[in-house]
A protein has these predicted regions:
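Glycine/charged-rich beta-loop-alpha catalytic/anionic-binding loops adjacent to active sites
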Residues: 71-77, 148-153, 186-201, 224-230, ...
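Phosphate/diphosphate-binding glycine-rich loops and adjacent basic-rich segments that engage nucleotide
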Residues: 597-684
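Cofactor-binding active-site loop characterized by glycine-rich and histidine/acidic residues
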Residues: 56, 63, 67, 72-267, ...
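Conserved acidic/glycine
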Residues: 1-90, 131-132, 142-145, 152-153, ...
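General beta-strand structural signal in soluble alpha/beta enzymes
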Residues: 104-107, 182-183, 212, 229, ...
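Thiamine diphosphate
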Residues: 88-92, 195-415, 499, 517-518, 584-585, 646-825, ...
Length: 825
């Protein structure tokens, strides 16, 4: 733990100089004749053919995008195509030494990397493995198309696998159901797990943190292989990339992780440096590093073993990969490569290239890597022109056949959302219950019964009231934070892949003491602190989960959701459906909703998460519900945003008779719970507002003789309206409440649906009682911002049913609603 590494003022204040090592730039200088000792003729020709395959594939896409045809085959592809002509040597050189168990992640411009890694995997895998992969992947849909089309050609298994790879990738780009992910991923999200090709990403730099999670998965779960993160030079302007590099370079891997876990992450950050972002020139205009490799010196003391290499020479790239893979296998990662290359095409086919000169493009084209490699082999008499002509013809035939098959609507249909109206709906969630993601013992430090927190909890009362009905004191009652702890600790013992991390998760016990006691039970590699890097926390969780593990990560405050916006809104919720259900996403994100800490630490942003399809969202308010819902979340395979309120971490269980069970149990998502029965008015509450709603119910009953039924939503997505409908049928009136600002809140979504579903039973419009549309004020002023018990009576009186002789203290009239909206508050 950190206190084993005391920080002494005499050490940190002493005068010295920070030293940097020289960073190699294009130091490879071997001639092809010299390299012929390491490669056979077949090796050289395979490198050439793989480069040609990428070039022809990308040229074909450009032709289809600009002319709607290729080699006489007509097709219109309205989707995106970010092409990589010119970058072939970089992709093929990188993939040459990578094994199928090594994983690559890419960007929106990664067709070439997909083909290079796939072709390399095909070369290395045996025929039986390839046959099994093709026949079983998505029930063999893509395989049947290419197998039938090539039945008369007597192809070997490896040759057929090449046809399968090119066709499957193209069918995916063309949004066909026979594509690698039924056309739901498309050009910018294509991948193929059996060959070690992990998701590419349409969000620039998106792989920068996701790939780190994949590397964590390999390290923590002792899986062989390395991870390569392919990003462009433009991505170096993005925060998540820097956060990912920081997370990948944490000192604790080498200082605090123990045993075989000690050592750096097996990840290589490869910058496909084609000199441009979209149109901005990174060197000389939009960035200040001059050489992208320079940034490694700012990340860790090893300077990330950074090197700038000639990506126009496939042998130079292979040489660099050989050296860097050795570094990674020695547990000295991460590694950074600045791979110099160039794209001949624009950012996309519609790019007018107004930001660069034709002379610049011509200069690069004259040094074309494919043509230069061919000439070198001929000059060194390592191959003949006829060899290249045969390779070229084979490549053109493969690409042409792929176009013919992928363009044919009979052979390659699109997903029919007319006849299969629920096809995408079924893919949004996997809805599996998987107690452990892998069946093996869990790494733990002690037996559960020896844990001091477990022993302390055993002495607590698990119900909030004693036999006489008196409240149990807070220091003796089983609290909401204890319920969360029990569910989490149990899962650590049960699922060996589970990791938990975030800010102050270890030693501190979590910012709000939920994790207190875990440090004693869980080894460092399964529970650790991260930098203050919310994007990397969530992004790495995505990568860890899609690799096969389960993650429990934490954002200290809901207000920090914005710091991980892309990762929560674009990455976490979408990959299950974009993969056609192949990927699972067992990630639980704990999000604490604050109070007392003002405008940037006290916001309820549940609506941001409920708005995004693909996320499950829960918000328990009692110890019983917290434990049961957390258990359900950790047993599932879907991403869950698990909101918790800081107001109520210390509450005891007031509703479940008998208290919170010591054994494990689940509460199904989507089922609201009646916390108080009533007959005149329904209150549907979200989160901690439950307790103020219950106070209001007491006031209604005591002062006005109105019987109130209080329902705790518990879960927001999914949500079963049946219990609410039954209540409204009885009461005819309902208030929906929560601590979020009212405008745009999930409360208004609930109210809209209740208005539709209960129209015939409602005696008055549905009332929504949220917080004011202001900044959250100081604690001393919060009673004027968050819903208070008296407000329920005020809004009931002015919007639902007047109470004789009552005068509202807060205005909720229609006039007031119009006034506030005119002002935008």
């Amino acid at each position: 733990m950190p206190k084993d590494m005391p920080i002494q003022p005499s050490d940190v204040r002493k005068a010295e100089w920070i030293k940097f090592n020289k960073i190699p730039v294009c130091q490879y200088d071997k001639q092809i004749e010299e390299e012929s000792k390491l490669y056979t003729k077949d090796d050289f020709l395979r490198i050439y053919k793989h480069m040609r395959m990428i070039r022809e594939f990308e040229t074909m896409l450009l032709s289809i995008k600009t002319t709607n045809a290729y080699k006489g085959l007509e097709y219109n592809n309205p989707g995106p195509a970010h092409l990589s002509m010119g970058q072939e040597a970089s992709a093929v050189g990188q993939a040459y030494l990578l094994s199928p168990e090594d994983r690559i992640f890419g960007s929106h411009r990664s067709h070439g990397e997909i083909l290079a890694k796939g072709l390399s995997a095909i070369h290395q895998l045996d025929d039986a493995s390839l046959q099994t992969i093709m026949e079983t992947f998505l029930d063999g849909r893509a395989y049947r198309v290419v197998e039938q089309a090539n039945r008369d050609r007597n192809l070997t298994v490896k040759q057929l696998a090449v046809e399968f790879l090119v066709y499957g990738a193209l069918a995916e780009i063309f949004a066909k159901e026979t594509g690698f992910h039924k056309g739901l991923g498309g050009s910018m999200h294509a991948f193929f797990l059996p060959f070690g090709i992990y998701p590419n990403n349409a969000i620039v730099g998106g792989s920068g943190s996701i790939s780190v999670g994949a590397a964590l998965y390999k390290k923590i779960n002792r899986k062989p292989g390395v991870v390569v993160c392919n990003i462009g030079d433009g991505a170096l302007g993005r925060g998540p990339v820097w956060e990912g590099m920081g997370l990948a370079s944490m000192d604790q891997y080498k200082t605090l992780w123990e045993g075989d876990m000690k050592g750096g992450l097996p990840i290589l950050f490869n910058i496909m440096n084609n000199q441009y972002a979209m149109g901005g020139q990174t060197r000389g205009e939009t960035m200040g590093y001059d050489f992208a490799a320079r940034i490694g010196a700012g990340v860790n003391a090893d300077q990330m073993h950074a090197e700038r290499i000639d990506g126009y020479n496939p042998l130079a790239v292979i040489d660099a990969m050989k050296r860097k893979l050795k570094v990674l296998r020695e547990k000295k990662g991460p590694v950074l490569l600045d791979t110099i290359t160039y794209r001949y095409s624009g950012h996309s086919p519609s790019d007018a290239d107004s930001y660069r000169t034709s002379e610049e493009k011509t200069a690069w084209e004259k040094e074309d890597s494919i043509e230069a490699f061919r000439k070198q082999l001929i000059k060194a008499k390592l191959a003949k022109q006829a060899d290249f002509e045969a390779a070229d013809a084979d490549v053109v035939r493969t690409v042409t056949d792929a176009v013919r098959l992928a363009a044919d609507p009979a052979l390659s249909p699109r997903m029919c959302l007319t006849s299969q109206t629920d096809a995408v709906e079924k893919l949004m969630f996997s809805n599996e219950r998987r107690l452990k993601m892998e069946d093996r013992p869990s790494d733990m430090l002690q037996k559960r019964e020896d844990n001091p927190r477990v022993q302390q909890i055993a002495r607590k009362e698990r119900f909030a009231f004693d036999a006489a009905g008196k409240p149990v004191s807070k220091n003796k009652v089983f609290q909401l934070r204890d319920g969360l702890f029990e569910a989490i600790l149990a899962k650590f013992y049960e699922d060996p892949t589970l990791v938990a991390y975030g800010e102050e998760n270890r030693d501190w016990g979590g910012a709000f003491a939920v994790y207190r006691g875990l440090t004693e039970a869980v080894p460092y590699h399964r529970l650790f602190n991260t930098p203050i890097s919310e994007a990397a926390i969530i992004g790495s969780a995505v990568g860890y989960a899609m690799s096969g593990g389960r993650v429990l990560c934490e954002l200290m405050y809901a207000d920090f959701l914005g710091c991980a916006g892309d990762e929560i809104f674009n990455q976490l919720p979408k990959w299950q459906a974009m993969s056609a259900g192949i990927l699972k996403m067992p990630v639980v994100v704990r999000v604490s909703v604050g109070s007392k800490y003002g405008a940037q630490h006290s916001q309820d942003w549940t609506a941001l998460c409920t708005h995004v399809p693909g996320l499950k969202v829960v918000f328990p308010a009692t110890p019983y519900d917290a434990k049961g819902l957390m258990t359900t979340a950790l047993n599932g395979t879907d991403p869950v945003i698990f909101f918790e309120s800081q107001r109520i971490y210390d509450v005891g269980e007031q509703f479940h008779k008998g208290g919170v069970p010591a054994e494990s149990y689940e509460i199904p998502f989507g089922e609201p719970d009646v916390k108080r029965a009533g007959k005149d008015l329904t209150i549907l509450s979200i989160g901690a507002t439950l307790y103020r709603a219950l106070e209001a119910a007491e006031l209604f009953e005591k002062e006005h003789g109105i019987s109130v039924e209080v329902i705790d939503a518990r879960s927001l997505v999914p949500f079963n309206y049946e219990a609410v409908m039954a209540s409204v049928k009885k009461t005819g009136k309902i208030i929906v409440t929560g601590d979020a600002c009212e405008r745009g809140s999930y409360m208004t979504e609930l109210a809209r649906n209740i208005s539709d579903l209960c129209f015939d039973d409602l005696d008055a419009p549905v009332a929504v009682l949220g917080s004011r549309n202001w900044i959250t004020p100081a604690f001393e002023l919060e009673e004027h911002f968050f819903p208070q018990p008296e407000w329920f009576i005020d809004i009931f009186h002015e919007r639902i049913q007047p109470i004789s002789g009552y005068v509202a203290k807060k205005p909720f009239t229609s006039v007031e609603t119009v006034r506030r909206n005119k002002l935008g508050v």
